[in-house]
Amino acid sequence: MKKLLNTLYVLTPESYLFCRNENICVQVGGTEKVAVPALTVDSIVCFGKMTVSTPLLEFCGKRGIGVTFLTQSGHFMGRFYGPVSGNVLLRKRQYESLNEPAFSRNLVQSILFAKLRNSKLVLLRAARTTKDDSTHNDLLAGAELLTQSAARLPSCETIDAMRGVEGSAATAYFARFDLMMQNNPAGFCFTTRTRRPPRDEVNALLSFTYMLLTREIQSAMETVGLDPAAGYLHTLRPGRPSFALDLLEEL
């Protein structure tokens, strides 16, 4: 089993990143602020204007450490990673499977089963921790709706039908999202899921986190030789990592 490592987030503008021996170092204004052992890191995320030394990029490329560049406000600019490996025959088989309806349906069903199961577990965990009876019952009702939605998936004959089941389940889940945030220290609240643009702090955080996860999934796919754009649940669209978005659904 692969060991899960850390992500180094660099938030200070005008930082300078370089490597020394087996350490990833961050310097600000000529003063070294931190040195992190590379063996504990599998990705670096840089916010805003900063400089990354060429030797560090070479160092990261050889060790499979991805470097993501975002604007100060969190918009994705680009990502660096080392040589793409993987079996070309795997990618060939992936393309062939796009034209196999039974394979596509089974894969999408598995993805959505996992999504509904994980969403249900989140609701049940919140129900166990709340002290309010009304909230507890509402969260349990939401979990039951997700169970019923999952039970409907095997009877869906098309991927479009499964998308409809997933959409209804997502509505039930997000209708209870604010209940899981009660009494949070920051005072955040959630009304409804909004995108492009997200219209409040919680939606902005959700979209930002999804973006980071999508890039991580995309990088992992390319590393093993899969095409992140060749998706099954999300339709094919130029410039969109549809397959990475498919797997993101489970999270």
Residue ranges and their predicted role:
Residues 1-72, 82:
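Terminal-proximal segments
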Residues 40, 48-121:
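A surface-exposed, charged beta-strand/loop segment in the N-terminal or early-internal portion
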Residues 1-20, 29, 35, 89-251:
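Active-site helix-to-loop segments that bind/position phosphate- or nucleotide-bearing substrates
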